[in-house]
């Protein structure tokens, strides 16, 4: 992912007085700071990101201009108006970034909750370990909330967390701040597809380990081969011999997943890793991890239903066995 950080500015929100501490200078983008910000941006393009395209007259989009200082002040104050009702507030850094990705200008807004950390102070003899406040999380940790906008296409990627207000959980970021309705994330979409397929299979008494394995294989194959997952195509794979089940599946998922789940600009590696193997836990305590291509090959693995209702698993053509 070719990302070049141009400018960045950082503000702080304190829950003690619910105030914003605004900066009047941009960050000095040293190599380490550039790496830190770049890694935070890269993590927004994950399977947890909601996506959408802003309308041209969207009020939030209209706040964004080439002047990062002016934009960041406007967005930070609007964010505070919406976030201030949260019942569980922490000290947060608000980071605003102008960057290019593959040569296209982008805007990013990161909310990063600061942490308490134990720090070893080398000069202290009697009490070398102390609790320090307002520490940024490490390089490998994503922002608590993040928005990235392609300024050319108006497409956005959003990582948001719900806040609690009067006992109710609110998607304040998308609904109130952005005034937008993004698609749910690929991760949640796939969970909805899995859950619905299991529900349909149960209603037709076909929800056994073989069906669950079929679901995993189908999801993996579609993502690997097409970089997307269509509910209709998945229904054809899972319920190929049952038209009623196919139609029921499509009907029940259309509200949560009305369109194919796409991985354009989204890192699909976590989903591929999740579904690349079949994991079987047997009643006798044996656990098997079988790659999909091996599991689907009858010359490698065979499941035999015995007359007494038990199963036997025949593993074939093994050239070498190692103990790990």
Residue ranges and their predicted role:
Residues 1-274:
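Long, hydrophobic alpha/beta structural blocks
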Residues 240-324:
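C-terminal structured domains
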């Amino acid at each position: 992912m070719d990302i070049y950080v141009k400018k960045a500015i950082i503000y702080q929100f304190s829950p003690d007085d619910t105030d914003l501490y605004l900066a009047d200078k941009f960050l000095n983008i040293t190599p380490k700071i550039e790496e830190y910000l770049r890694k935070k941006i890269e993590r927004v393009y994950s399977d947890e990101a909601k996506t959408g395209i802003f309308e041209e007259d969207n009020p939030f989009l209209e706040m964004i201009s080439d002047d990062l200082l002016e934009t960041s002040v406007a967005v930070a104050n609007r964010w505070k108006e919406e976030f201030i009702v949260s019942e569980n507030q922490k000290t947060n850094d608000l980071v605003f970034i102008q960057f290019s990705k593959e040569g296209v200008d982008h805007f990013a807004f990161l909310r990063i909750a600061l942490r308490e950390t134990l720090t070893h102070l080398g000069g202290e003899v009697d009490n070398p370990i102390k609790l320090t406040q307002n520490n940024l999380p490490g390089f490998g940790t994503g922002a608590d909330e993040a928005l990235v906008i392609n300024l050319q296409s108006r497409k956005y990627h959003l990582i948001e967390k719900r806040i609690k207000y009067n006992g109710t959980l609110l998607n304040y970021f998308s609904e109130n701040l952005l005034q937008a309705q993004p698609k749910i994330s690929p991760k949640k979409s796939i969970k909805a597809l899995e859950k619905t397929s299991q529900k349909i299979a149960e209603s037709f008494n076909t929800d056994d380990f073989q069906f669950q394995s079929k679901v995993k294989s189908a999801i993996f194959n579609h993502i690997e081969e097409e970089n997307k997952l269509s509910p209709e195509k998945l229904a054809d794979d899972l319920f190929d011999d049952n038209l009623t089940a196919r139609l029921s599946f499509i009907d029940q998922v259309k509200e949560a997943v009305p369109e194919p789940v796409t991985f354009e600009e989204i890192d699909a590696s976590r989903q591929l890793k999740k579904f690349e193997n079949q994991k079987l836990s047997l009643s006798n305590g044996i656990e098997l991890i079988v790659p999909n291509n091996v599991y689907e090959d009858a010359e490698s693995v065979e499941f035999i239903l015995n007359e007494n209702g038990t199963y036997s698993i025949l593993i074939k053509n093994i050239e070498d066995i190692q103990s790990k």
